[in-house]
Amino acid sequence: EVDSLWYDKHAKEVLRKSEEEYGWVYKTNHANNSTEGQIVLDTVKKEGIINYTVWSDVFICPTCGEEIIFTEVQKSSENLRDAFICSRCSRKLKKGECERAKEYVYDELLRQTTEIAKQVPVLINYSYNGKKYEKKPDAEDIRKIEEIAGMSLPYKVPFIKLPEGYNTNQPRKSHGIKYLHQFYTKRNLYVISVVYNNLAKYDTPERQTLTFTFEQILMGMSKIARYVP
């Protein structure tokens, strides 16, 4: 049995301490929707808090080699169901006909460069002044993502190789994911390490409950979380 007052107090404490360390990674410039996502120019910088970022898979057109951002062609090809048009050569394609674009990234935990399926940020949902907004990632968002990608994790995170099996072979084959930490973007992995570190400071039986609560959101932070407009 958990003392509810203790839980409430220390859960908020973990969040507060964690946000002091990682809060900046989820900040984004507020955009004026009336100007089609252009950044609001003001003497006072307006920043919102990111709720989530939508990442899109990238495919290669087998005819012309153009990189195709899947969510963008889905929007422009709504009447074609599972088919879409290459913006460069105009060929009508299906997802299964295209190879995934790949990229090489340095994996800090593996201490080596690894090949993974390329994904790019296409939408940011954020809160500003009590309201939710959506925008395309701007130059500052991209710069911040790249900055975090080059940073070292401040604390340890679980390092677990995926076991062989039907469900684990799917992400291994489609996205090159072979380890648990590869399910997360560097930004989310950074935050996970901070929160786990703050949870580890509690040497009490209640720590298990706090940790369990945090772990319930890990699936939603992963690359396999589906975006439903």
Stretches found by the model and what they are:
Residues E1-P229:
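Nucleic-acid modification enzymes, centered on SAM-dependent nucleic-acid methyltransferases
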